[in-house]
């Protein structure tokens, strides 16, 4: 992979929230059209990493290159144009309760439309067939004119996915996109995202708690722990030993016993 074909390139990126280091010198490259899952324990920094990639937050140190641009070296207007090429699916999509589903989906292209068209779309949805089509792929065609406040958590997540698919971004970042869905819907939704990415050449990155879904749907898996990359390898190379090291919980470990000092090496992919 060369820098020229990297959709996302992080150079020693760190992120601090006050005294807490959320990300610690993360360096990685994700090629255009790649499909990558990010896994790790709660609080590992997965969401922070995705939001940094989306330019929602600026790294405290280090550098991000996104689609060949350095976002934080751009003017605010140029950075906004860059963001319009990136889709971000939130774990809990920030959809107003009284907003209709059709409007929520069409809002995926607000960054590509002018102000007037965006405002008119709130009153008179401009592409009802397009919204219906993408919702149908997620089993929500019958919810087209329902208010978002009437939907379940899993349905809201599917609306968030539909919105991102309608946007047609070059990079699609998804933060726990199926956490509120039952296993069948979660599997279907991730399969749909992957089919869409393969068909359109979109770069797809998803943070997931469910390791089995990450391994089943994504060719490349990155393990994050305490803000650092623990492993980065093909899904078929992820071993039980790697997962044990990634999810080891010192608070749940049994009390230490007296014995010789052991040196433990974490296997590399």
UniProtKB/Swiss-Prot annotation:
Pfam families: ABC_tran
Gene3D superfamilies membership: P-loop containing nucleotide triphosphate hydrolases
GO terms under cellular component: plasma membrane
Predominant place of localization: membrane
Residue span(s) of domain ABC transporter: 8-251
Keywords: ATP-binding, Cell inner membrane, Cell membrane, Membrane, Nucleotide-binding, Phosphonate transport, Translocase, Transport
One MF annotation (Gene Ontology) recorded for this entry: ATP binding
Swiss-Prot/TrEMBL catalytic activity: phosphonate(out) + ATP + H2O = phosphonate(in) + ADP + phosphate + H(+)
SUPFAM superfamilies: P-loop containing nucleoside triphosphate hydrolases (SSF52540)
Plastid keyword on record: no
Disulphide linkage map: none
Topological type in the membrane: Peripheral membrane protein
InterPro entries per record: AAA+_ATPase, ABC_transporter-like_ATP-bd, ABC_transporter-like_CS, MetN_ABC_transporter-like, P-loop_NTPase
Binding of ATP, residues: 40-47
The keyword Phosphoprotein belongs to this UniProt entry's keyword annotation: no
Top-rank lineage group of the source organism: Bacteria
Family: Belongs to the ABC transporter superfamily. Phosphonates importer (TC 3.A.1.9.1) family.
Functional summary from the UniProt entry: Part of the ABC transporter complex PhnCDE involved in phosphonates import. Responsible for energy coupling to the transport system.
Protein name: Phosphonates import ATP-binding protein PhnC
Originating species: Pseudomonas putida (strain ATCC 47054 / DSM 6125 / CFBP 8728 / NCIMB 11950 / KT2440)
Gene label: phnC
């Amino acid at each position: 992979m060369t820098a020229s074909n990297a959709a996302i390139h992080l150079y020693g990126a760190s992120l601090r929230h006050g005294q807490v280091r959320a990300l610690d010198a993360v360096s990685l490259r994700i090629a255009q059209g790649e499909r990558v899952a990010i896994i790790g324990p709660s609080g590992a920094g997965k969401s922070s990493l995705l939001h940094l990639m989306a330019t929602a937050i600026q790294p405290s140190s280090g550098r991000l290159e996104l689609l060949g641009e350095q976002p934080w070296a751009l003017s605010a207007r140029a950075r906004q144009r860059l963001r319009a090429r990136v889709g971000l699916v939130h774990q809990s999509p920030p959809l107003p309760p009284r907003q209709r589903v059709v409007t929520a989906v069409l809002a995926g292209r607000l960054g590509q439309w002018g102000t007037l068209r965006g405002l008119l779309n709130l009153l008179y949805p401009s592409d009802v067939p397009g919204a219906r089509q993408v919702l149908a792929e997620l089993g929500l065609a019958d919810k087209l004119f329902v208010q978002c406040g009437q939907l379940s958590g899993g349905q809201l997540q599917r609306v968030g996915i539909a919105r991102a698919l309608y946007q047609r971004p070059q990079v699609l970042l998804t933060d726990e996109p199926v956490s509120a869905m039952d296993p069948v819907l979660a599997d279907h939704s991730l399969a749909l995202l992957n089919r869409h990415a393969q068909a359109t050449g979109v770069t797809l990155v998803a943070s997931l708690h469910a390791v089995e879904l990450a391994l089943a749907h994504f060719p490349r898996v990155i393990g994050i722990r305490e803000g650092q990359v623990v492993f980065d390898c093909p899904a078929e190379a992820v071993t039980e030993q790697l997962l044990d090291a990634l999810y080891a919980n010192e608070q749940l470990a049994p009390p230490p016993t007296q014995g010789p000092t052991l040196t433990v090496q974490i296997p590399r992919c």
